[in-house]
């Protein structure tokens, strides 16, 4: 903890930083390791990043191939009391699918290019963009809030109230997307890059 009594939370990517910010308000000190737009696949932690992880109370990462550096860092630090949350462990996972312009929208072939789904170890063939699903965001936010309440029990009511409010907002957004999907005129989405929204579109069939 910091001298002001706040717990320290470190996140790898912005979605989880934002979840913590929505759930914890000013009760925690949050550090984001990768700035928005950074490529997590090419990220290498700086010494200051490793120090931040060692000194934090909760460390939140995505897990999977994009965070393959995490286990090495965690094994190297002396503080073994850091609570580690790998978000891919908190939601149902979906296998990567080929969704480029040369395939039909409902293709279910595994991606086999050089950096996706190829020569991966077992357990690494899943699509890692789990945060794009609003329903996954609800699951992950609830788990993060529970961990905050466990580590910082004196502020449990505060975290629980914010969890209830935030999940209510997410649920409302989910209902709006459901309504849009139920009234859609087309079943096609066009992307000019690798398709990152498998979890999102799966929520709405």
Question: What are the residue ranges of the model-derived segments?
Answer:
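Extracytoplasmic metal-acquisition and chelation regions
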Residues: 1-205
